[in-house]
A protein has these predicted regions:
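Catalytic Walker B motif of ABC-type/P-loop ATPase nucleotide-binding domains
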Residues: 152-156
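Conserved ABC ATPase signature
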Residues: 127-131
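Conserved ABC ATPase "signature" region
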Residues: 99, 103, 108-123
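Conserved catalytic motifs of ABC-family nucleotide-binding domains
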Residues: 148
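ABC ATPase "signature
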Residues: 211-212
Length: 251
């Protein structure tokens, strides 16, 4: 499968400090690619350079054949961005906001279909402040789809959500990928990365340490002799929580 993102020597500096240190990676068309790392590793800065939100101080990033540094406007036309702290307008309904976002791209959007995709049809006339945490995150993703992006960037999309809302969002992310959209996400949750991502890049101190599928990374660790005491259960506490509170969406 061909690459839709190619990154070579990508670098970001703030004064004397280099926070992203000449990293290389590629993302295949149609995959979910995750970037894992501790706070301060450079994950968000890397995404922001790919999104043309921060200047690139060294190296290159190419998305769908377009150089990010040379053509930032063209890049913004083909990507969707869901930030950690997405801000919406308090005085506009969900329907009005999606129409406004679409107008910024000069595109038309079927608002009803988009709200149905994120299971917010009944909230079409509501304001963002009236939504639960999970509903806000789903609406944030809906807002990134108004321009039919080829690549969707999600920065810690399930932070602050309860287990049930997290699983609902996972299903939405997988559905979007099945429709042909490439997804690049950052996360602190190992279970999320293992469930969603086809491949992962693990970052630390501004560098990419390794890139591979979750399965291969685990197998490589085991081959090095890693062992831990493990009790295999058929369910976990998160499963209990969701079973007791209901499997239908209750955000």
């Amino acid at each position: 499968m061909s690459n839709i993102i190619d990154v070579h020597g990508l670098t970001k500096r703030y004064g004397d400090q280099t926070v992203v240190k000449g990293i290389d990676f590629s993302v295949e068309k149609g995959e979910i690619f995750g970037i894992l790392g501790p706070n301060g590793a450079g994950k968000t800065t890397t995404l922001e350079m790919l999104e043309a939100l921060r200047t690139i101080d060294g190296g290159t990033a190419v998305i769908d054949g377009i150089d990010v540094a040379k053509h930032p406007k063209k890049i913004k036309d083909i990507i969707g961005i869901q930030l950690q702290s997405t801000n919406f307008y308090d005085h506009l309904t969900l329907t009005e906001q999606l129409k406004m976002f679409a107008s910024l791209y000069g595109s038309k959007v079927d608002v009803a279909a988009l709200l149905a995709k994120v299971q917010l049809t009944e909230k079409a006339r509501n304001y963002v402040e009236q939504l639960s945490g999970g509903q806000k995150q789903r609406f944030a993703i809906a807002s990134t789809l108004v321009n039919s992006p080829k690549v969707l960037f999600l920065d810690e999309p399930t932070t602050g959500l309860d287990p049930q809302a997290r699983r609902n969002l996972w299903e939405l992310i997988k559905q979007i990928r099945e429709e042909g959209v490439t997804i690049v996400l950052t996360t602190h949750y190992m279970d999320e990365a293992e469930l969603l991502c086809d491949r992962l890049a693990i970052m630390d101190n501004g560098q990419i340490i390794t890139t591979d599928s979750p399965h291969n990374l685990i197998q490589q660790l085991l081959k090095r002799g890693f062992k831990k005491k493990q009790v295999v259960e058929q369910a976990n506490l998160e499963d209990v929580f969701i079973d007791l509170t209901g499997k239908a969406i209750r955000d």
